Regions:
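The two-metal-ion catalytic cores of nucleic-acid processing enzymes
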Residues: 1-230
């Protein structure tokens, strides 16, 4: 089993991992977090890279982990800063094959207001009018679009009928809902400047037209997207 991503849930002392099996099916697995550090002790059974004898301390909860470190605050500690995610991956996935990831490359088109100008990710006041996605696992290019105000639905269908995989919608909300369904099995969502514009703008429009909870559909484990600063 190959891992795709992992997430440390400190308040639950769990490491959550997303896997793909040999058939390409995605699975979610929870592991107990392991908290480990070492300290100098002449009776220790472990050695540092410098040859110093070390004693191993392993805890099952973060609270206990902090307590054990405080007890030995007068000693030099080793590996107390290693993320539990990395320990989990080392113990369970070392040597496993790299998975074939399901990747979506996407690009959005946004309406323009002659009075207010272009909208930004901080204030996404204009609707998304089209989304084009490339799905790596099916080798498909799919376009979802809301016809412009100057074109009715029948006219839009005539204009796009010669193109494959074009889906037309009356409302932006319906288009965004279909987009979330379309990318449900994606492991990676990417595109040109997507972190700086397309992803945060899409998140903003989902919040405005659907709901804040619907943004969870973009992430593993039902987490909400977190804005990155550059």
């Amino acid at each position: 089993m190959s891992y795709i991503d992992a997430f440390y849930k400190r308040d639950e002392d769990k490491v959550r991992v997303v896997e793909r099996d040999s058939k390409g099916q995605r699975k979610f697995v929870d592991y107990d977090a392991r908290y480990t550090f070492y300290y100098p002790d002449s009776r220790g059974k472990h050695r540092s890279i410098f040859g110093e004898q070390l004693q191993k301390v392993q805890c099952s909860t973060f609270k206990q982990f902090i307590k054990e470190q405080k007890i030995r605050s007068n000693k030099k500690l080793y590996e107390q800063d290693i993320n539990p995610v990395f320990r989990c991956l080392e113990e369970n996935y070392l040597g496993k094959e790299t998975p074939k990831l399901n990747v979506v490359f996407f690009d959005i088109e946004v309406d323009f207001d002659p009075q207010r100008g272009y909208s930004t990710t901080d204030d996404p006041f204009m609707p998304i009018t089209a989304i084009t996605c490339y799905l790596s696992w099916s080798d498909q290019l799919v376009t979802l679009a809301v016809p412009p105000k100057t074109l009715n639905m029948s006219g839009a269908k005539m204009a796009t009928e010669r193109f494959e995989n074009v889906m037309l919608f009356e409302k932006e909300a319906d288009m965004l809902d279909a987009f979330l369904t379309l990318i449900d099995d994606a492991d990676i969502l990417s595109g040109w400047n997507s972190e700086g514009y397309d992803i945060p703008y899409t998140v903003g429009r989902i919040q405005k037209t659907l709901s804040s909870d619907d943004t969870r559909r973009l992430c593993f484990w039902g987490e909400k997207p977190k804005r990155r600063t550059f």
